Amino acid sequence: MDYYRKYAAVFLVMLSMFLHSLHSLPDGDLIIQGCPECKLKENKYFSRLGNPVYQCMGCCFSRAYPTPARSKKTMLVPKNITSEATCCVAKSFTKTTVLGYARVENHTECHCSTCYYHKV
């Protein structure tokens, strides 16, 4: 009887580890690793049958490097690290009404450009 309990315990531990790892994976895109290129993707929240709403999503260029000494001298608040980045933004868009009252931008073309909104 102890023989079967040992295998049952091992099976339950392995099953719980598998379910935990499966639950911790991101939703969808399980095969794609890293960040996808900047492109249009359908916004499932605002899209309705016959009236899809698209938004720009994906990654662009970013890097950080030590601030050169001569640049630090001209800064009001000297910083040791300087960063550069471009964001995936809409090159063109149209305004559309969704849910009967909300006006949103339906992106039609994307490109990598200056970041206007940063997450803090």
From Swiss-Prot:
Taxonomic classification: Eukaryota, Metazoa, Chordata, Craniata, Vertebrata
Signal sequence range: 1-24
Record flagged with keyword Disulfide bond: yes
InterPro entries hit by this protein: Cystine-knot_cytokine, Glyco_hormone
Cystines in this chain: 35-59, 38-88, 56-110, 60-112, 87-115
Subunit structure and binding partners: Heterodimer. The active hormones thyrotropin, lutropin and follitropin are heterodimers composed of CGA, a common alpha chain described here and a unique beta chain which confers their biological specificity to the hormones: TSHB for thyrotropin, LHB for lutropin and FSHB for follitropin.
Keyword Disulfide bond attached: yes
Function per UniProt: Shared alpha chain of the active heterodimeric glycoprotein hormones thyrotropin/thyroid stimulating hormone/TSH, lutropin/luteinizing hormone/LH and follitropin/follicle stimulating hormone/FSH. These hormones bind specific receptors on target cells that in turn activate downstream signaling pathways.
Sequence similarity: Belongs to the glycoprotein hormones subunit alpha family.
Database matches in SMART domains: GHA
Subcellular location: Secreted
Gene Ontology MF term list: follicle-stimulating hormone activity
Protein name, UniProt field: Glycoprotein hormones alpha chain
Alphabetically ordered keywords of this record: Disulfide bond, Glycoprotein, Hormone, Secreted, Signal
GO BP terms: G protein-coupled receptor signaling pathway; positive regulation of steroid biosynthetic process; regulation of signaling receptor activity; thyroid hormone generation
GO cellular component terms listed in the entry, alphabetical order: extracellular space; follicle-stimulating hormone complex
Main location: secreted
Organism: Alexandromys montebelli (Japanese grass vole)
Glycosylation sites noted in the Swiss-Prot or TrEMBL record: 80, 106
